[in-house]
């Protein structure tokens, strides 16, 4: 079944050939150790819904201080609640790539983008030990691009995937910061009765791991929880963050949008709502839904399911 390869790659980070691989997953060993004058547009911070200005002219190399978070760049979102000065994570460039407390010299400083967008910055030469590294580079007190051919820090996906929340309360989903710390701390909050885009990255041109395509992965939480409370590392027995009940996957390749949902193998928690993969104007490869604690449909097995959509949009409906 299509889903089985997808899940195996997501969990073990083994570079299997898959229709929609996830890249190195948050179950990686180093993650468990982590437990202990340009055009202006207006954006909205998904964590506190305050308006702020955004610059569309691209990020200038060596201008911003490392102590200054570039939240005037189009699509970039501050995550102050994580305690890294707005950054989603900071990695030391010392061969081990452990976490630093602040963006400082010789570190990679990663950042969140608003829903539907993905960061564009990571060093082309990645560690050979399976760790991924991402973000801007801090050198001599200034921030520098790690992908010089793209000065826009965030980019849109294909725009063909989203989440529709028909519940009365909000649901927060947390994207893995990848390549980077791989923490599940990139927030998307979907208010009841609304929808939000997913980052359906173009897998043919986005970051690849070991020569394999990668897609976006999300941790899906119970309803009524704020992103600040659940898009963080939890502890064994919790039902949020890396212990959230469910995972979503989204991506675009071979002219198709791919959506996947699966139980989080680390967690025994269950969601308090149901989910169905649907299409708006497209053709689904099969049926897939989660209801009353189990997966159902022509593409489902006991762990989850994967569906491709040709034409139109694909979405997760929460009900």
Swiss-Prot record:
Biological process (GO), any one: fungal-type cell wall organization
Alphabetically ordered keywords of this record: Carbohydrate metabolism, Cell wall biogenesis/degradation, Glycoprotein, Glycosidase, Hydrolase, Polysaccharide degradation, Secreted, Signal
Signal peptide residues on this chain, from the entry's feature table: 1-19
GO CC terms in record: cell surface; extracellular region; fungal-type cell wall
Record InterPro entries: Beta-Glucosidase_SUN, SUN
UniProt subcellular location: Secreted
EC number in record: 3.2.1.-
Superkingdom to which the source organism belongs: Eukaryota
GO MF annotations in UniProt: beta-glucosidase activity
Enzyme class of the recorded protein, top EC level: hydrolase
Glycosylation sites per record: 36, 39, 45, 48, 221
Chief location category: secreted
Pfam families recorded: SUN
Protein task: Cell surface beta-glucosidase involved in cell wall biogenesis.
Family the UniProt entry places it in: Belongs to the SUN family.
Protein name in the entry: Probable secreted beta-glucosidase C2G2.17c
Organism: Schizosaccharomyces pombe (strain 972 / ATCC 24843) (Fission yeast)
């Amino acid at each position: 079944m299509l889903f089985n390869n997808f899940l195996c790659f997501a969990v073990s980070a083994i570079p299997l050939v898959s229709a929609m691989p996830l890249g190195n997953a948050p179950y990686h060993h180093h993650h468990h150790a982590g437990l202990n004058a340009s055009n202006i547009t207006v954006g909205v911070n998904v964590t506190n819904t305050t308006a702020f200005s955004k610059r569309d002219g691209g990020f200038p190399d060596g201008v911003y201080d490392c102590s200054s978070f570039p939240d005037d760049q189009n699509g970039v979102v501050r995550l102050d609640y994580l305690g890294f000065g707005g950054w989603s994570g900071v990695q030391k460039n010392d061969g081990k790539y452990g976490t630093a407390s602040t963006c400082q010299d010789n570190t990679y400083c990663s950042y969140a983008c608003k829903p539907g967008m993905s960061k564009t910055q990571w060093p082309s030469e990645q560690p050979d030990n399976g760790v991924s590294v991402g973000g801007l580079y801090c050198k001599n007190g200034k921030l520098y691009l790690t992908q010089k051919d793209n000065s826009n820090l965030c980019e849109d996906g294909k725009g063909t995937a989203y989440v529709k929340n028909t519940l009365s309360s909000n649901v927060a989903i947390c994207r893995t910061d990848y390549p980077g710390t791989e923490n599940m701390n990139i927030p998307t909050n979907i208010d009841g009765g609304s929808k939000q885009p997913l980052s359906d990255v173009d897998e043919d041109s986005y970051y690849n791991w070991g020569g394999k395509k990668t897609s976006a992965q999300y941790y899906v939480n119970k309803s009524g929880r704020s992103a600040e409370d659940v898009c963080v590392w939890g502890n064994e027995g919790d039902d949020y963050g890396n212990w959230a009940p469910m995972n979503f996957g989204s991506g675009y390749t071979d002219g198709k949008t791919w959506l996947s949902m699966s139980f989080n193998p680390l967690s025994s928690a269950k969601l308090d709502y149901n989910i169905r993969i649907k299409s708006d104007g497209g053709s689904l490869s099969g049926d897939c839904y989660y209801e009353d604690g189990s997966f159902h449909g022509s593409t489902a097995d006991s762990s989850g399911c994967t569906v491709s959509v040709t034409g139109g949009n694909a979405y997760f409906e929460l009900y």
